[in-house]
Curated annotation (Swiss-Prot):
UniProt region (Disordered), positions on chain: 1-28
InterPro entries: DUF4633 (IPR027990)
Name of the protein: Uncharacterized protein C11orf86 homolog
Species of the source: Mus musculus
Comp. bias (Basic and acidic residues): 9-28
Length: 124
């Protein structure tokens, strides 16, 4: 009983697999450094000037003053300082999603402006 072509393909490595392993075999230091620099706002990104033209390259933290980076959010989360704000943002997000969901049904409203009798009255 010979092996089929399909089963052989699983046993023999394909050339594309070698490239995949090579790309994963890179040093983690470079990728880790890049990830950290992205999160800390060291990487540059283009900003838009209000008139629509592209402006100078500005770091993320310069563009968004007052926002916390991932590291600061993590530290604040460990201290427990941002849990109320996070809960409020989460509740607002849920409320927006719920309103969006309800709006997808044309005959359903979140609050009724009048009693059902008033809505059924056709004499108005």
């Amino acid at each position: 009983m010979g092996t089929s072509l399909r089963s052989q393909s699983f046993r023999e490595p394909r050339p594309s697999y070698g490239r995949l392993h090579e790309s994963q075999g890179r040093s983690l230091d470079g990728r880790l450094h890049r990830a950290l620099s992205l999160r800390l706002g060291r990487e540059k990104s283009r900003s838009q000037v209000p008139d629509g033209t592209e402006g100078l390259e500005v770091s993320v933290q310069e563009r968004l003053p007052g926002t916390l980076g991932d590291k600061e959010q993590l530290i604040q989360g460990q201290r427990g300082g941002g849990s109320r704000r996070w809960l409020r943002q989460y509740q607002q997000h849920v409320k927006r999603r719920w309103r969006s969901f309800v709006a997808s049904f044309p005959s359903v409203t979140l609050s009724q402006p009048a009693s059902p009798e008033t809505l059924l009255d056709t004499n108005n």
